[in-house]
């Protein structure tokens, strides 16, 4: 059995980085994290009946009388058991003499995962029986007294990392799942990172931690919101999708620097890795520009970063929205690996290849390509067919695969239509080697880039399933993305505009004139923070001029300004220039811990359908309880219910 150690390391710092996030961690890691915040190690046994925790005992405690409380993790042949608490594991010797028969009975008959209290003496393990993999592996407890605090019924699953459980079963019995090493580590690391963020913001930089209301009013645009009925007929509160308006109002109120660990809510339906309620590190500052916000966040992450990971290197690189789309085909690129999109339009200006010629003859037409290193070695024919079918089905685009053989000769259906000079120029531009595969497409710029961006990730997945490591799991690659468009055409009516992010985002200073002539071309002062292909934060400089805010809302977005009259009125009373950002805490901790889902870093998450499987929530409410809210439930027909799911 492997006895992990994590709590003391979390406090005291690691002697070596943990390279595999999937390895069990216990005991010393938690201690290192607290120690890294320059605080003394907390006293875990104050105010309680135990004298020590299971994971803290060492050879320095030999001869001491101790009282321990915990769960029975494992028992062997009624001679010893392993006792577990949040701090770690310790071996307990079951007494065999008749004078201790009552103690033996308790410890031998209590089911695994029962809660017991034992008192005894710390002694050395017999020579040759030490366990170097276990932090307490040099000692054991010679028990004198024992008490069964609570017996455990038959478990729905074993609480061991190597025992596979379905996620539904884990969520149904979440209180048992929380006992696992990995969940303990995830939640304690989350707690310590938040503590260090508070320390950095409030103690070092003068931010004020302020709670904003949870009951608010419906906001125009943005994600769908949860409604909360009131006792006034036909009137509802709304759960805020972010404290956006409140934090701007705090700046108007002169608070200058605001911070909150904010609970937010979005009614987005069934999303595989989203939660209807989530947590963000919410920040707003007065008299700040984009550079100031970025520097603050870089320092915040550097200060709060766990010691068992490689340190955060600042400043983070920055790319514009146009650059990341052209290079990676997405606004949240994973920059841990290459396979960048290359524009090869100039090579084919005079081509005889039909679909390339057709694409280049149209406005914004382009020819793009990505190079899959050693793709000929790892990609199978069915993989290439799958890629081509995906391009046709989802993008209505054609993909042309080119295989490079020995001497980088081309193996492609169009090889005979490509001149030698074109072939050599492509090899130079794409920096290809033998056994590489080039995926080439042609079409409108944004569409071609988006397709290749999807295929870049798909091919990375394929290569990694075949043993090629492209994305180092220990590497954290941050990127700022800036200069987003301020508006996007509405999907349902492309002639109308909607905010690319939210309607309070200030336009780029160089593009303010475009609001009155060509608003579709206006850039915003919005910025996203991307980590390993995931957006972990987003913010902007806000509009602090009431007249400009009214113009954008009423004239460009066709929104009812009465719904935001409180904010517009506040901007009229001397609002300072201000800006802010929100970091998605759940997503950030998920990436830091290497967890497969954000549900693994939340104590009591919802399922992907938004259900709490432990308490069977949401639940129905009897009509008499709805009556004070003037609400009556009208159940949908079967066809409507099916569409809802």
Swiss-Prot record:
The modification Phosphoserine is found at residue 242. Residues 1-47 form a transit peptide. Changing residue 263 to Q: In LBSL; no effect on its mitochondrial localization. It comes from the Eukaryota. The modification N6-acetyllysine is found at residue 382. Its EC number is 6.1.1.12. Keywords: Acetylation, Aminoacyl-tRNA synthetase, ATP-binding, Disease variant, Ligase, Membrane, Mitochondrion, Nucleotide-binding, Phosphoprotein, Protein biosynthesis, Transit peptide. Changing residue 613 to F: In LBSL; no effect on its mitochondrial localization. GO terms for molecular function: aspartate-tRNA ligase activity; aspartate-tRNA(Asn) ligase activity; ATP binding; protein homodimerization activity; tRNA binding. Pfam families: GAD, tRNA-synt_2, tRNA_anti-codon. Changing residue 184 to K: In LBSL; Significant impairment of its mitochondrial matrix localization. InterPro entries: Aa-tRNA-synt_II, aa-tRNA-synth_II, aa-tRNA-synth_II/BPL/LPL, Asp-tRNA-ligase_1, Asp-tRNA-ligase_1_N, Asp/Asn-tRNA-synth_IIb, AspRS_core, GAD-like_sf. Changing residue 338 to E: No effect on its mitochondria localization. Residues 244-247 are annotated as: Aspartate. Changing residue 58 to G: No effect on its mitochondria localization. The modification Phosphothreonine is found at residue 219. L-aspartate binds at residues 266, 542. GO terms for cellular component: mitochondrial matrix; mitochondrial membrane; mitochondrion; nucleoplasm. Its main location: mitochondrion. It is linked to Leukoencephalopathy with brainstem and spinal cord involvement and lactate elevation: Autosomal recessive disease and is defined on the basis of a highly characteristic constellation of abnormalities observed by magnetic resonance imaging and spectroscopy. Affected individuals develop slowly progressive cerebellar ataxia, spasticity, and dorsal column dysfunction, sometimes with a mild cognitive deficit or decline. PANTHER family: ASPARTATE--TRNA LIGASE, MITOCHONDRIAL, ASPARTYL/LYSYL-TRNA SYNTHETASE. Catalyzes the attachment of aspartate to tRNA(Asp) in a two-step reaction: aspartate is first activated by ATP to form Asp-AMP and then transferred to the acceptor end of tRNA(Asp). Belongs to the class-II aminoacyl-tRNA synthetase family. Type 1 subfamily. Homodimer. This is Aspartate--tRNA ligase, mitochondrial. It comes from Homo sapiens (Human).
